[in-house]
């Protein structure tokens, strides 16, 4: 513990508020956003989905999954596995962002670019939702989140 009192450690952990697109919680209008768009790979996305799905109301949660990069020959299979996992977990509302997710077999909404989602949300934003957002850094999914109205 390096001589740091337990109470001080607890206070530091409890007061930590991420602001770097890594597991960042924020209010955007009437929505609560969980933004984890700094980096993603199949294992981190799977773990995040498995953690979020049982805790968030399926009817009130919108999942936004952005393409996972640098997977080489495994890319197609990995993206299909993520979509299959989403369905297995009972995820009802999702937007898949990027050409790799668009190529999968899925029942969800799909857009090719983050800017397409940002434009759609600027015209017709979701409301009163929990919005889970995760994808590779290069997808810049925070641009879509930024299109949502700020909290008044």
PLM regions and their residue ranges:
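ATP-dependent carboxylate-amine ligase
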Residues: 1-152
């Amino acid at each position: 513990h390096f001589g740091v009192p337990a109470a001080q450690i607890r206070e530091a952990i409890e007061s930590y508020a991420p602001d770097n697109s890594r597991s960042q919680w924020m209010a955007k209008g009437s929505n609560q956003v969980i933004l984890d768009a700094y980096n993603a790979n199949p294992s981190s996305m799977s773990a995040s989905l498995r953690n979020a799905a049982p805790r968030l109301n399926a009817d009130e949660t919108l999942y936004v999954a952005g393409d996972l990069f640098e997977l080489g020959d495994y890319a197609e299979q990995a993206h299909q596995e993520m979509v299959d996992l989403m369905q297995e977990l009972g995820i009802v509302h999702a937007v898949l962002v990027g050409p790799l997710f668009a190529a999968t077999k899925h029942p969800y909404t799909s857009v090719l670019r983050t800017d397409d989602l940002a434009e759609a949300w600027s015209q017709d934003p979701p409301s009163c939702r929990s919005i889970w957002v995760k994808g590779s850094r290069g997808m810049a999914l925070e641009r879509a989140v930024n299109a949502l109205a700020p909290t008044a």
